Each structure stands twice: as C-alpha cells, then as structure tokens.
Amino acid sequence: MRVAEVTRNTSETQIRVSLNLDGSGRQKLASGVPFLDHMLDQIARHGMFDLEVEATGDTHIDDHHTVEDVGITLGQAVARAIGDKKGITRYGHSYVPLDECLSRVVIDFSGRPGLEFHVPFTRARVGSFDVDLTIEFFRGFVNHAGVTLHIDNLRGINAHHQCETVFKAFGRALRMAVELDPRAANTIPSTKGTL
C-alpha cells in the first residue's frame, strides 16, 4: 500500500497528515481553518485519496502559517507515499468547471519543484479566508513533493468557485499522475532512469 504519515512541528504550527494514495476518498479534516478543510475535502474526494489532517497553529495572528505548513506536510506525505516513483503515470492534468468558472491543473512528478500559478481572484477573501494563501499552500506542496505544477483559472467571477475548481482539478490531476500504469510496472517514467 502507498501510505504515509508525516508530522511537522514548529514554533508556529503542529501538523499531522495521514495519506493513502490508493484510498476511496475518505477524509477526516481538522486544520483549524474551515475553508482550507473544505478545499482539502475536494482533493480527497476528487483524487480518491484517504486523507487525515490535524493542525493547530497561530491562527490568532492569521491563517498563513497553518495553510502553508499543511501544504508542506501534504507534499512530504505524497513524496513518501509514492516512494521511488516506479510504475507511476508521472503526468496528470484536469479541467474542472463549476458554473461560470473553469480551471486547469497540470502536474509532473519530475523531481524539479516549480509552480506556475495564474488565478486572477475576483475578491480578496472567501468568507474569512484570504485567497492569497492559496498560492502559499501550493508553493509549500510543490517544494516538498518535488513536482512541477501549473495552475490556471481560465475564467471565473465567483472567488469561491475559482478556489474550488482549482482544488478539484488538483485532486484529479494528482490522482492521474500517481496512478500505477501496469504497462510500466517497475520502471521509472523517465529516459534518464531516475526522477
């Protein structure tokens, strides 16, 4: 089974992430940031991952450290669960619509962290959630999962829909990329022989 549990403790946050890449979309989420929990639910359900997140942090200051550190810890959990990358599809992509909104996410388990994030949010907050923290979540994930990630909101008016389509598309793209390809069996999906 491709599972991992990662704990991250700093002076700002205490995070625990448990992940099963071959799950059924079950989740248990308690990040302390309700909108983040809603977005993590999208990743679990649309990626078909079993995901548990427990976090406490300095949310009395703001949500920045918690959101970023959950992204970091999730990235570490994915990297650990995927192991040597033998047999994975490597690349994943997804387009997800929600009413007027359309987002595209493309991921490559290249071993080279890189983020292209193009989401022109139409407002600064969704409820109490600062939408600027979305990029911090994905930057933390990318740097610790070792992936190249392109996120584009192609159109949208409602900032909640913009966030939600991004996270849904991310879950689906991630699911595609980590899927085991029986034809590739025990090979690394690279002409270099390593990722």
Swiss-Prot record:
What is the protein's given name?
Imidazoleglycerol-phosphate dehydratase
Involved pathway(s): Amino-acid biosynthesis; L-histidine biosynthesis; L-histidine from 5-phospho-alpha-D-ribose 1-diphosphate: step 6/9
Pfam (any one): IGPD
Family, per the entry? Belongs to the imidazoleglycerol-phosphate dehydratase family.
- Enzyme kind, highest EC tier: lyase
Task: Provide the organism lineage as a comma list.
Answer: Bacteria, Pseudomonadati, Pseudomonadota, Betaproteobacteria, Burkholderiales
NCBIfam families assigned: PRK00951.1-1, PRK00951.1-5, PRK00951.2-1, PRK00951.2-4
**This protein's record includes keyword Cytoplasm:** yes
User: One Gene Ontology cellular component annotation?
Assistant: cytoplasm
The molecular function terms of the Gene Ontology recorded here are: imidazoleglycerol-phosphate dehydratase activity
| EC numbers, comma separated | 4.2.1.19
Subcellular localization, per the record?
A: Cytoplasm
What keywords sit in the KW lines?
Answer: Amino-acid biosynthesis, Cytoplasm, Histidine biosynthesis, Lyase
Which coarse location class describes where this protein primarily resides?
cytoplasm
Q: What PROSITE patterns does the annotation carry? A: IGP_DEHYDRATASE_1, IGP_DEHYDRATASE_2
